[in-house]
Amino acid sequence: MQEKLQAIVAQAKETIHSVSELVHLDEIRVQYLGKKGELTAMMKTLGQLSAEERPKAGQIINEAKQSVQTFLSEKKAELEDAILAAKLAGETIDVSLPGRGLDTGGLHPVTRTLRRIETIFSKAGFDVATGPEIEDDWHNFEALNIPETHPARAMHDTFYFDENTVLRTHTSGVQIRTMEEKDAPMRIIAPGRVYRCDSDQTHTPMFHQVEGLIIEENTSFAQLRTLIIEFLRQFFEDENLKVRFRPSYFPFTEPSAEVDIATNLFGDGRWIEVLGCGMVHPNVLKNVDVDSEKYTGLAFGLGVERLAMLRYGVTDLRQFFENDLRFLKQFK
């Protein structure tokens, strides 16, 4: 019996060693250790032995079964390791391959421009003030020395809710509200959305504006001129930027001026208007109970989209509001 068991174990070892797939390994287990397996059949022959021989024979058969089970376990572990190694080899990361970057978003060019403007003026001591976009007649017109006969009040220029309520046409109303609520001296800028009945290559019904106000003693137009030139040169990062002031008219400032810069945006070095400014009209100060004998004011207003167009080389203002990602992704 012992010789037969040794032959079975040797054959099992050889067969197991030659297996290359787990499914075949299970077939071999059934062949030797299953209910009808060769070693199981050997156990059934113990009844043919004498009582003295059975313990020794049973021990030998069990040792043979354990040997075969050990071969099977070792081979199974070997095959599983090979399968895992092959899988890992197929999934190896090539660290020399450039990573795939996330498609991150970015600030809208108008937002970037607004933040740039706020940063520059904050360095000059200006606070940021805000106010409602739906404005009453007093804050949008009357307090700013704009009479009922002024063209800006016309229906084709202003969006009316009723005869006394409008979508604000400028952020100057924020200046009025601030002067009503706070005492001079003050320096503020009022950024925000404004609305006018206008739409073409350089105008949209809704756009962004920043208006600035200084109420202090002994202000002068020379101070205003220096402030604006310095702002424009910082904004465009050009210390040699050409800036000119032209006499103009605004109901809420006197004297008033429009400011142009020389630009090659259209390829011809033309002068482009970028903002309006002036000394705050005494009537405006009177309307908000500011002592015009003690204080004088400087005011300016600029279109954010206009500055964004000039800074980024955009020739059609409407592109800022069409939500075309091909356009907007340029400004990340």
Curated annotation (Swiss-Prot):
Any single GO CC term annotated in Swiss-Prot or TrEMBL for this entry: cytoplasm
EC number: 6.1.1.20
Catalytic activity: tRNA(Phe) + L-phenylalanine + ATP = L-phenylalanyl-tRNA(Phe) + AMP + diphosphate + H(+)
Enzyme class: ligase
Cofactors: Mg(2+)
Cofactor comment: Binds 2 magnesium ions per tetramer.
Gene Ontology BP annotations: phenylalanyl-tRNA aminoacylation
Molecular function terms, GO-annotated: ATP binding; magnesium ion binding; phenylalanine-tRNA ligase activity; tRNA binding
Binding annotation for Mg(2+): E254
Gene3D superfamilies found in the cross-reference section: Bira Bifunctional Protein, Domain 2 (3.30.930.10)
Major localization class: cytoplasm
Pfam family, one: Phe_tRNA-synt_N
Keyword tags: Aminoacyl-tRNA synthetase, ATP-binding, Cytoplasm, Ligase, Magnesium, Metal-binding, Nucleotide-binding, Protein biosynthesis
InterPro entries to which the protein is assigned, alphabetical: aa-tRNA-synth_II (IPR006195), aa-tRNA-synth_II/BPL/LPL (IPR045864), Phe-tRNA-synth_IIc_asu (IPR004529), Phe-tRNA_ligase_II_N (IPR004188), Phe_tRNA_ligase_alpha1_bac (IPR022911), Phenylalanyl-tRNA_Synthase (IPR002319), tRNA-bd_arm (IPR010978)
Localization per Swiss-Prot or TrEMBL: Cytoplasm
NCBIfam families the UniProt entry points to: pheS (TIGR00468)
Entry similarity comment: Belongs to the class-II aminoacyl-tRNA synthetase family. Phe-tRNA synthetase alpha subunit type 1 subfamily.
PANTHER family reported for this sequence: PHENYLALANINE--TRNA LIGASE, MITOCHONDRIAL, PHENYLALANYL-TRNA SYNTHETASE
Subunit structure: Tetramer of two alpha and two beta subunits.
Record's protein name: Phenylalanine--tRNA ligase alpha subunit
Organism expressing this protein natively: Hydrogenovibrio crunogenus (strain DSM 25203 / XCL-2)
